[in-house]
């Protein structure tokens, strides 16, 4: 019985490691987010795509929420460099136009327009650039 339990735990951990192995890899997140397109359009998601869709929505919404927090605290002088504050503030520039669906769509669009950045840019920075392009926000210089 103990051997069976140990084997089940090992298999579960292996699956978790494989599912999260590439979260910092922009190409992986973009691929997951492409599978989310039907869900974002209000259509169903095939059973086999539910995990990647959940990973996309969870990852992107977590980053967007973190960016909003950073934007709210970035008014403190010297807290963040100006260019970084502009990208982060983009998340809250036009809240009426933003939803996780629009943020994910902007992320996919930016990735499609800049495929050369996918293998050299960390995912959070890629999302920041996508948001800055789609939802520009001007922050006065210090």
Where do the language-model regions lie?
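Sec-dependent signal peptide recognition
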Residues: 1-8
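Short, structural beta-strand-to-alpha-helix junction motif
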Residues: 21-29, 99, 121-122, 126
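N-terminal signal peptide c-region/cleavage motif recognized by signal peptidases
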Residues: 14-19
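C-terminal partner/receptor-binding element of secreted or periplasmic proteins
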Residues: 117-142
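Short N-proximal segments of mature Sec-exported proteins
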Residues: 26-105
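Amphipathic alpha-helical segments in well-ordered regions
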Residues: 62-66, 110, 130, 134
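Helix-rich interaction surfaces within compact, conserved domain-sized segments
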Residues: 100-111, 115, 127
């Amino acid at each position: 019985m103990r051997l069976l339990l140990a084997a089940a735990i090992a298999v579960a951990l292996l699956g978790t490691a494989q599912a999260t192995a590439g979260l910092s890899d922009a190409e992986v997140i973009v691929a997951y987010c492409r599978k989310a397109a039907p869900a974002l359009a209000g259509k169903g998601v095939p059973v086999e795509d539910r995990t990647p869709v959940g990973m996309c929505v969870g990852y992107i919404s977590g980053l967007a929420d973190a960016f909003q927090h950073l934007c709210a605290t970035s008014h403190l002088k010297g807290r963040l460099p100006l260019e970084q504050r502009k990208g982060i503030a983009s998340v809250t520039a036009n809240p009426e136009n933003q939803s996780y669906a629009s943020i994910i769509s902007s992320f996919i669009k930016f990735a499609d327009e800049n495929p050369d950045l996918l293998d050299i840019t960390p995912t959070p920075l890629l999302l920041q650039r996508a948001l800055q392009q789609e939802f520009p926000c001007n922050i006065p210089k210090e």
